Design a protein with these regions (language model features):
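Membrane-interface capping segments at transmembrane-helix boundaries
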Residues: 84-86, 336-343, 528-539
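Alpha-helical transmembrane segments of multi-pass inner-membrane proteins
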Residues: 2-14, 18-50, 68-80, 106-118, ...
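Long, low-complexity, intrinsically disordered segments
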Residues: 549-565
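TM-adjacent membrane-interface loops and short helices in multi-pass inner/ER membrane proteins
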Residues: 204, 396-446, 460-464
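Aromatic-rich transmembrane-lumenal/periplasmic boundary elements in polytopic membrane proteins
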Residues: 132, 173-188, 366-425
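Short, hydrophobic transmembrane alpha-helix segments
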Residues: 49-64
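Non-cytosolic membrane-interface motifs at loop->transmembrane helix junctions
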Residues: 61-62, 126-135
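Transmembrane alpha-helix boundary signature
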Residues: 79-95, 114-127, 182
């Protein structure tokens, strides 16, 4: 690529472009350091934390996360007090703006408090149900960590690298479990029910898939906007390792989150290099599938989790080799075009066309579901029936839970419709009222709605669900609007969005939801940091918007600490 700084309109810029053309970042404060410690605890230590048993893993995660947030609060308060005592005017002058995201977070928590006050099961609404433990206590921890991180977490370019290497041990354990091995002895200590459905140090494979979804979103976002060889290889490895983990989880909800990633990323592709990096993602996914095929074959064909769905297709389908070759060819072709014409920028019209096509496809699918579910409910659909006909069997019997949850919500009084019956009390909707029906359906017991949004609707009401959806929408919107200035904002916004999409088919719990709220808070913090940098007055004339809207050529780690390379 031609040197941007050599263009005629920018020849007046200072020679030392890394240190003089941009405002010097403010010095690190004690609050910033404390936030770094909490981020490391939440993204590296927490996913690995366990007590060696799947039966009580949720409690172990709760026992780690709650003290971590309380410690974060205490240390942040002490650090802030010391700063106020030393530089009172400087600290008080830097008041953080109150955003829509903040308002939605408070609304979400306030609804949980009100629902607890009026709940028929106040103790359960406070602590959460057995194994889930997702009551008012952990919602309070999410709220505290959100406000602390969004105010004090800055210079976050190191986060994707730490997240990448921190997740690798989790994925390695997941791979070993998938191959029928038990290196930590979890299965020997856990009951048979959990042995069948749990993997790694995360627990249920659906929870594991939600963790992988967030990881892949961060890696893909960083890969898409990478400009140099080293970060491209690094985040490419991250996508490859995450793809292997996703296959090991063998959860449809995880692939739904990945599908959301594929349809959103094209809106951020601006040139041939980024298109090449986009094509690299499915290429790495198919490559991971074939690598898993050989690993399973080397293991004698033994897998703990039966091969099914997309995992089976990626591993065993001959077409996977064809797709791998096609995607690899696209990558090479686009890189050659970028080498020939590095200054080419794709027109906005292409993104508009993609948006129209996406909206049309979404509408067509919804129309098909409505038609085959309500108008022509007897038409034979074959294998498509489990996708296009919404009934009790839809979505691995999730339809049963959704229909009953909405039926119960319709019978709520006004107060319950607004604030629900108490956080994590959904099991009282199903047990014992629908126990017999659940046994007839497939010997499956539902203690939750298997949909995060409906779960919040019936437990903390329409007010709580509105706060939750509004929080996600606000953070994602703010992140995407700033994606042109920071690839980290794009990556974190994608992580929030992918978790939100897979949450349609998953549940909130203490194994991965704390990681989600941490990434959500970091996305908000990243947006605030970008806004603060925009308000700062540079010592030299500011640089015009660069191609790819990235910072000057510098490594992510050195950028994180504001040092020139």
């Amino acid at each position: 690529m031609k040197d941007f700084y050599a263009s005629p309109q920018n020849r007046s810029l200072p020679a030392d472009r890394h240190t003089k053309a941009f405002p010097t970042p403010p010095p690190l404060t004690a609050n910033n350091v404390v936030s770094v410690l909490f981020i490391l605890a939440a993204l590296v230590v927490f996913p690995l934390w366990s007590n060696g048993r799947y039966d009580t893993l949720a409690q172990a995660k709760l026992d780690f996360f709650v003290p971590a947030v309380i410690s974060f609060l205490i240390l942040s308060a002490v650090a802030l007090l010391c700063r106020i005592l030393v530089h009172p005017k400087r600290v008080l002058r830097r008041a953080e703006p109150f955003t829509v995201s903040d308002a939605m977070m408070l609304l979400f928590f306030a609804a949980a408090v009100v629902s607890w006050q009026y709940s028929q099961w106040p103790e359960e609404a406070y602590w959460g149900s057995d194994y889930r433990h997702h009551g008012l206590v952990i919602l309070a921890m999410y709220t505290l960590s959100y406000f602390l991180l969004s105010r004090f977490a800055r210079r976050l370019n190191w986060v994707p690298v730490v997240f990448l290497f921190g997740a690798l041990p989790v994925f390695w354990l997941g791979l070993q479990n998938f191959l029928g091995k038990d290196p930590l002895g979890f299965y020997a200590k856990s009951s048979a029910h959990f042995v069948k459905t749990c993997i790694s140090t995360i627990g249920n494979w659906n929870f594991y898939a939600s963790f992988v979804c967030m990881y892949l979103a961060v890696m893909c976002g960083m890969l898409l906007k990478s400009r140099k060889t080293a970060p491209t290889l690094l985040y490419g490895f991250g996508v490859f390792s995450g793809s292997i983990a996703l296959i090991c989880g063998s959860s449809d909800s995880g692939f739904v989150g990945l599908a959301a990633l594929f349809v959103i990323l094209p809106f951020f592709i601006c040139n041939w290099r980024q298109l090449a990096h986009y094509a690299m993602i499915p290429a790495l996914l198919f490559l991971a599938g074939k690598a898993m095929h050989f690993m399973v074959a080397g293991n004698g064909g033994v897998t703990k989790i039966p091969l099914r769905g997309f995992s089976k297709m990626l591993m065993e389908s001959i077409a996977g080799w064809v797709f791998l070759a096609v995607c690899t060819g696209i990558v090479v072709f686009c890189l050659i075009l970028h080498k020939i014409k590095p200054d080419v920028s794709f027109p906005v019209a292409l993104k508009v066309i993609w948006g129209v096509v996406l909206a049309a496809c979404t509408f067509a699918v919804l129309l098909a579901v409505v038609y085959f579910s309500a108008i022509n409910a007897t038409a034979p659909l074959g294998n498509l029936e489990k996708y296009l006909r919404f009934n009790d069997h839809w979505g691995s019997t999730r339809g049963f839970a959704w229909i009953r949850a909405l039926r119960e919500y319709a019978g709520y009084d006004t107060l319950q419709k607004l604030f629900g019956t108490g956080a994590d009390t959904a099991k009282h909707l199903f047990m014992p009222k629908y126990y017999t029906a659940m046994m007839r359906l497939g010997n499956a017991v539902f203690e939750n709605v298997h949909n995060e949004y409906l779960q919040y609707l019936v437990t903390i009401g329409a007010v709580g669900m509105t706060g939750y959806i509004g929080l996600i929408a606000s953070v994602v919107t703010r992140s995407f609007r700033r994606a042109g200035k920071s690839k980290l904002a794009l990556a974190l916004g994608l992580a929030v969005l992918c978790y939100a999409v897979q949450g349609v088919f998953n549940i909130t719990q203490t194994m991965t939801t704390p990681v989600f709220f941490t990434l959500l808070a970091l996305a908000e913090a990243c947006c605030r940091g970008i806004d603060a940098a925009g308000r700062a007055k540079p010592s030299q004339p500011s640089v015009a918007k660069m191609p790819d809207a990235e910072t000057p050529a510098a490594s992510d780690i050195m950028q994180a600490f504001g040092k020139p390379v």
